[in-house]
Amino acid sequence: MGKYESVKEKRLYLIAMIGAIVCFIGDNLLGAFTPASDFGNKLLCVNFSYEWADSNPYRFVVAGICGVVSLLMMFAGFYGIYMRLKEKNNRNSKIFLCSSFVFVSVGTLYHNVFAVTAYTYNRLRADGIANAKEISLDVFNTFILVGALAAVGYACMVIIMFISTIRGELFKNRWMCMVNPFIFMVICIVLSKVLPQTAFVNGVFNLGQQSIGLFIVFCFFYFTCNR
């Protein structure tokens, strides 16, 4: 890889790293950081918080914007990984690119479903609507199955990254197959369970698990551009 291509690739990962930070901020704005009492579907998402009713509704608007902007920025990093796979004539490079596009495009919907649900619940409670929770959950359940396609794209990406690293197509050292966003997500999940249940632990390791995992991975790619 030439010097110009290396600098260009590093810029892509730098943009993606910033995007992961913005995503972390959006997740924590949306997640209330300290859900004292909550409700919702634990299998699909972090719980909704009753504290949303007492929050500034524009917080959820900002959270939704952060989610959309951050995913678009992180696509730059995914494109950089695609270019590295393409350079090695990886037969799965186009599948990776398509998967990352699905993850980003549908992921923006996923973020907005959460934001709209939180905003709806907040405004209905402010207007004294008795069944605000049920209405909000109806909104969530109507759209979240479409947003779940983001998980399919994400799964395809992490599998391709893992296999390609073992083949020596992403990093020189095959042990770096452990540099995988899914693995870092699992570590964050474990930490969120074993550490004391505080607002900080919940915000960082529960709500921010995916953005932290992607941030670490983009950092590794950033510092290995001159491989």
Where do the PLM segments sit?
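Hydrophobic, aromatic-enriched alpha-helical segments typical of multi-pass transmembrane helices
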Residues: 1-227
